[in-house]
Protein backbone atom coordinates (compact mmCIF):
# COMPACT_ATOMS: atom_id res chain seq x y z
CA UNK A 1 0.00 0.00 0.00
CA UNK A 2 1.54 3.31 -1.12
CA UNK A 3 0.13 6.11 1.03
CA UNK A 4 2.95 8.63 1.55
CA UNK A 5 2.51 8.33 5.31
CA UNK A 6 4.21 6.21 7.96
CA UNK A 7 1.84 3.57 9.30
CA UNK A 8 2.50 2.41 12.84
CA UNK A 9 0.72 0.13 15.25
CA UNK A 10 0.06 0.56 18.93
CA UNK A 11 1.37 -1.91 21.47
CA UNK A 12 -1.38 -3.66 23.47
CA UNK A 13 0.10 -2.28 26.69
CA UNK A 14 -3.15 -0.67 27.87
CA UNK A 15 -5.25 -3.79 27.33
CA UNK A 16 -5.68 -5.39 30.78
CA UNK A 17 -5.54 -8.93 29.39
CA UNK A 18 -2.13 -8.33 27.81
CA UNK A 19 0.86 -9.76 29.68
CA UNK A 20 4.44 -8.59 29.37
CA UNK A 21 5.11 -11.60 27.17
CA UNK A 22 2.22 -10.58 24.90
CA UNK A 23 3.47 -7.01 24.57
CA UNK A 24 7.02 -8.02 23.66
CA UNK A 25 5.82 -10.67 21.21
CA UNK A 26 3.66 -8.00 19.56
CA UNK A 27 6.63 -5.61 19.35
CA UNK A 28 8.88 -8.23 17.75
CA UNK A 29 6.26 -9.29 15.23
CA UNK A 30 5.31 -5.72 14.29
CA UNK A 31 8.98 -4.91 13.72
CA UNK A 32 9.34 -7.98 11.51
CA UNK A 33 6.15 -7.27 9.56
CA UNK A 34 7.33 -3.82 8.56
CA UNK A 35 5.24 -1.37 10.56
CA UNK A 36 6.96 2.02 10.68
CA UNK A 37 6.49 2.59 14.39
CA UNK A 38 5.21 1.19 17.67
CA UNK A 39 3.05 3.35 19.93
CA UNK A 40 1.99 3.51 23.56
CA UNK A 41 -0.89 5.15 25.40
CA UNK A 42 -0.51 6.44 28.95
CA UNK A 43 -2.38 6.63 32.22
CA UNK A 44 -1.86 5.81 35.90
CA UNK A 45 -5.19 4.62 37.33
CA UNK A 46 -5.75 1.64 35.06
CA UNK A 47 -4.37 -1.85 34.60
CA UNK A 48 -1.84 -0.87 31.94
CA UNK A 49 1.91 -1.27 31.68
CA UNK A 50 3.83 1.93 32.42
CA UNK A 51 4.95 3.76 29.30
CA UNK A 52 8.67 4.43 29.72
CA UNK A 53 9.73 0.91 30.83
CA UNK A 54 7.50 -0.52 28.09
CA UNK A 55 9.29 1.57 25.48
CA UNK A 56 12.68 0.49 26.83
CA UNK A 57 11.61 -3.16 26.65
CA UNK A 58 10.29 -2.70 23.11
CA UNK A 59 13.59 -1.09 22.11
CA UNK A 60 15.43 -4.17 23.33
CA UNK A 61 13.44 -6.62 21.19
CA UNK A 62 13.25 -4.56 17.98
CA UNK A 63 15.80 -3.10 15.60
CA UNK A 64 13.98 -1.04 13.01
CA UNK A 65 10.59 0.43 14.00
CA UNK A 66 10.45 3.84 15.64
CA UNK A 67 8.97 4.13 19.14
CA UNK A 68 6.28 6.79 19.62
CA UNK A 69 4.61 7.75 22.89
CA UNK A 70 1.07 8.74 21.95
CA UNK A 71 1.03 10.34 24.37
CA UNK A 72 3.15 10.54 27.53
CA UNK A 73 1.50 12.62 30.25
CA UNK A 74 4.45 14.38 31.84
CA UNK A 75 3.19 16.80 34.56
CA UNK A 76 2.31 14.07 37.06
CA UNK A 77 5.79 12.61 36.58
CA UNK A 78 7.21 15.71 38.24
CA UNK A 79 10.92 16.36 37.91
CA UNK A 80 11.78 17.46 34.38
CA UNK A 81 15.49 16.67 34.66
CA UNK A 82 14.84 13.08 35.71
CA UNK A 83 12.25 12.62 32.98
CA UNK A 84 14.63 14.08 30.38
CA UNK A 85 17.28 11.58 31.52
CA UNK A 86 14.83 8.66 31.30
CA UNK A 87 13.74 9.60 27.79
CA UNK A 88 17.33 10.18 26.65
CA UNK A 89 18.14 6.72 28.01
CA UNK A 90 15.38 5.11 25.92
CA UNK A 91 16.57 7.06 22.88
CA UNK A 92 20.12 5.81 23.47
CA UNK A 93 19.04 2.21 24.06
CA UNK A 94 16.95 2.25 20.88
CA UNK A 95 19.67 3.74 18.73
CA UNK A 96 17.77 6.98 18.17
CA UNK A 97 14.33 5.58 17.40
CA UNK A 98 12.27 7.44 20.01
CA UNK A 99 9.61 10.07 19.25
CA UNK A 100 8.04 11.64 22.34
CA UNK A 101 4.41 12.67 22.11
CA UNK A 102 3.58 14.63 25.28
CA UNK A 103 0.58 16.41 26.77
CA UNK A 104 -0.99 17.46 30.07
CA UNK A 105 -3.76 14.83 30.12
CA UNK A 106 -7.33 15.28 31.28
CA UNK A 107 -7.98 12.66 33.98
CA UNK A 108 -7.95 14.13 37.47
CA UNK A 109 -7.69 10.69 39.10
CA UNK A 110 -4.20 10.18 37.64
CA UNK A 111 -3.06 13.37 39.35
CA UNK A 112 -4.78 12.50 42.61
CA UNK A 113 -3.10 9.09 42.63
CA UNK A 114 0.34 10.64 42.16
CA UNK A 115 -0.19 13.47 44.63
CA UNK A 116 0.28 16.11 41.94
CA UNK A 117 -1.69 19.23 41.07
CA UNK A 118 -4.27 18.73 38.34
CA UNK A 119 -5.16 22.41 38.07
CA UNK A 120 -1.53 23.48 37.87
CA UNK A 121 -0.47 20.89 35.31
CA UNK A 122 -0.04 23.41 32.49
CA UNK A 123 2.55 25.43 34.41
CA UNK A 124 4.45 22.26 35.31
CA UNK A 125 4.33 21.12 31.68
CA UNK A 126 5.81 24.39 30.44
CA UNK A 127 8.69 24.06 32.90
CA UNK A 128 9.32 20.45 31.87
CA UNK A 129 9.46 21.31 28.18
CA UNK A 130 12.02 24.02 28.88
CA UNK A 131 14.00 21.55 31.00
CA UNK A 132 14.03 18.99 28.18
CA UNK A 133 15.53 21.57 25.84
CA UNK A 134 18.23 22.46 28.36
CA UNK A 135 19.16 18.91 29.37
CA UNK A 136 19.22 17.54 25.83
CA UNK A 137 21.36 20.45 24.64
CA UNK A 138 24.04 19.37 27.12
CA UNK A 139 23.72 22.24 29.58
CA UNK A 140 26.19 21.90 32.45
CA UNK A 141 24.39 21.20 35.73
CA UNK A 142 27.11 20.27 38.20
CA UNK A 143 30.73 19.32 38.73
CA UNK A 144 30.29 16.24 36.53
CA UNK A 145 28.97 18.36 33.68
CA UNK A 146 25.74 17.70 31.81
CA UNK A 147 22.95 15.26 32.63
CA UNK A 148 23.58 12.20 30.48
CA UNK A 149 23.39 10.04 28.58
CA UNK A 150 23.29 12.23 25.52
CA UNK A 151 20.31 11.27 23.36
CA UNK A 152 21.21 9.34 20.23
CA UNK A 153 19.33 11.96 18.22
CA UNK A 154 21.10 15.33 18.26
CA UNK A 155 19.15 17.76 20.41
CA UNK A 156 17.01 14.97 21.83
CA UNK A 157 14.15 12.85 20.55
CA UNK A 158 11.60 14.87 18.57
CA UNK A 159 8.75 16.23 20.69
CA UNK A 160 5.19 16.10 19.38
CA UNK A 161 2.86 18.18 21.52
CA UNK A 162 -0.68 16.95 22.10
CA UNK A 163 -3.79 18.98 22.83
CA UNK A 164 -6.10 21.45 21.11
CA UNK A 165 -5.97 24.46 23.45
CA UNK A 166 -4.25 27.75 22.64
CA UNK A 167 -1.54 26.73 25.10
CA UNK A 168 -0.99 23.46 23.20
CA UNK A 169 -0.55 25.37 19.95
CA UNK A 170 1.91 27.74 21.63
CA UNK A 171 3.90 24.85 23.10
CA UNK A 172 4.08 23.13 19.72
CA UNK A 173 5.56 26.23 18.12
CA UNK A 174 7.95 26.95 21.01
CA UNK A 175 9.20 23.46 21.83
CA UNK A 176 7.85 20.90 19.39
CA UNK A 177 8.95 19.21 16.21
CA UNK A 178 5.23 18.92 15.50
CA UNK A 179 1.80 18.00 16.83
CA UNK A 180 0.02 14.76 17.68
CA UNK A 181 -3.75 14.42 17.55
CA UNK A 182 -5.45 12.48 20.31
CA UNK A 183 -8.14 10.82 18.22
CA UNK A 184 -11.33 12.23 16.75
CA UNK A 185 -10.91 11.08 13.16
CA UNK A 186 -9.45 12.62 10.00
CA UNK A 187 -11.67 15.72 9.95
CA UNK A 188 -10.78 16.71 13.51
CA UNK A 189 -7.13 16.03 12.73
CA UNK A 190 -7.24 18.22 9.62
CA UNK A 191 -8.69 21.15 11.57
CA UNK A 192 -6.06 20.87 14.29
CA UNK A 193 -3.20 20.47 11.83
CA UNK A 194 -4.24 23.63 9.98
CA UNK A 195 -4.16 25.62 13.24
CA UNK A 196 -0.64 24.37 13.87
CA UNK A 197 0.51 25.20 10.34
CA UNK A 198 -0.73 28.79 10.66
CA UNK A 199 0.88 29.28 14.08
CA UNK A 200 4.12 27.66 12.86
CA UNK A 201 4.31 30.04 9.92
CA UNK A 202 3.33 33.08 11.98
CA UNK A 203 6.13 32.31 14.45
CA UNK A 204 8.70 32.10 11.66
CA UNK A 205 9.52 28.43 12.27
CA UNK A 206 11.39 26.91 9.35
CA UNK A 207 10.32 23.75 7.58
CA UNK A 208 7.10 21.87 8.18
CA UNK A 209 5.80 20.57 11.51
CA UNK A 210 5.51 16.80 11.80
CA UNK A 211 1.98 15.50 12.31
CA UNK A 212 0.88 12.25 13.92
CA UNK A 213 -2.50 10.80 14.82
CA UNK A 214 -4.04 7.65 16.23
CA UNK A 215 -7.12 5.48 15.76
CA UNK A 216 -8.40 2.21 17.22
CA UNK A 217 -9.00 -0.91 15.18
CA UNK A 218 -10.21 -4.49 15.44
CA UNK A 219 -10.57 -7.01 12.63
CA UNK A 220 -12.14 -10.43 12.13
CA UNK A 221 -15.59 -11.85 12.90
CA UNK A 222 -15.59 -10.54 16.49
CA UNK A 223 -14.22 -7.09 15.65
CA UNK A 224 -17.15 -5.06 16.97
CA UNK A 225 -17.33 -7.07 20.18
CA UNK A 226 -13.60 -6.64 20.82
CA UNK A 227 -13.75 -2.89 20.22
CA UNK A 228 -16.82 -2.35 22.38
CA UNK A 229 -15.51 -4.44 25.27
CA UNK A 230 -12.08 -2.81 25.47
CA UNK A 231 -12.97 0.79 24.64
CA UNK A 232 -16.03 0.91 26.91
CA UNK A 233 -13.76 -0.13 29.76
CA UNK A 234 -10.78 2.08 28.91
CA UNK A 235 -12.95 5.16 28.42
CA UNK A 236 -15.42 4.48 31.23
CA UNK A 237 -14.35 7.77 32.86
CA UNK A 238 -16.17 9.55 30.00
CA UNK A 239 -19.51 8.10 31.04
CA UNK A 240 -21.99 7.61 28.21
CA UNK A 241 -19.56 9.17 25.72
CA UNK A 242 -17.50 5.98 25.91
CA UNK A 243 -20.06 4.49 23.52
CA UNK A 244 -19.13 7.12 20.93
CA UNK A 245 -15.45 6.23 21.25
CA UNK A 246 -16.21 2.53 20.85
CA UNK A 247 -18.37 3.23 17.81
CA UNK A 248 -15.50 5.14 16.17
CA UNK A 249 -13.22 2.09 16.13
CA UNK A 250 -12.28 0.84 12.68
CA UNK A 251 -13.75 -2.66 12.42
CA UNK A 252 -13.55 -3.46 8.71
CA UNK A 253 -10.95 -3.45 5.97
CA UNK A 254 -12.89 -0.75 4.14
CA UNK A 255 -13.03 1.51 7.21
CA UNK A 256 -9.29 1.15 7.82
CA UNK A 257 -8.41 1.86 4.19
CA UNK A 258 -10.70 4.89 4.14
CA UNK A 259 -9.23 6.42 7.30
CA UNK A 260 -5.67 5.79 6.15
CA UNK A 261 -6.37 7.61 2.89
CA UNK A 262 -8.15 10.50 4.61
CA UNK A 263 -5.42 11.02 7.20
CA UNK A 264 -2.78 10.96 4.47
CA UNK A 265 -4.74 13.46 2.38
CA UNK A 266 -4.96 15.76 5.43
CA UNK A 267 -1.16 15.84 5.71
CA UNK A 268 -0.60 13.32 8.49
CA UNK A 269 2.96 11.97 8.53
CA UNK A 270 2.41 9.07 10.96
CA UNK A 271 -0.79 7.21 11.79
CA UNK A 272 -0.79 4.77 14.71
CA UNK A 273 -3.50 2.11 14.74
CA UNK A 274 -4.08 0.82 18.28
CA UNK A 275 -5.47 -2.68 18.79
CA UNK A 276 -8.46 -3.65 20.92
CA UNK A 277 -7.10 -7.14 21.59
CA UNK A 278 -3.57 -8.43 22.32
CA UNK A 279 -4.10 -11.48 20.09
CA UNK A 280 -1.31 -11.57 17.49
CA UNK A 281 -3.90 -12.54 14.90
CA UNK A 282 -5.04 -8.91 15.02
CA UNK A 283 -1.55 -7.76 14.09
CA UNK A 284 -1.31 -10.19 11.19
CA UNK A 285 -4.74 -9.18 9.86
CA UNK A 286 -3.68 -5.53 9.88
CA UNK A 287 -0.36 -6.34 8.23
CA UNK A 288 -2.13 -8.31 5.49
CA UNK A 289 -4.14 -5.19 4.75
CA UNK A 290 -1.51 -2.47 5.09
CA UNK A 291 2.01 -3.86 4.77
CA UNK A 292 1.69 -5.75 1.52
Q: How should each PLM-predicted stretch be described?
A:
Residues 1-292:
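Active-site-adjacent structural elements that line small-molecule/cofactor binding pockets in enzymes
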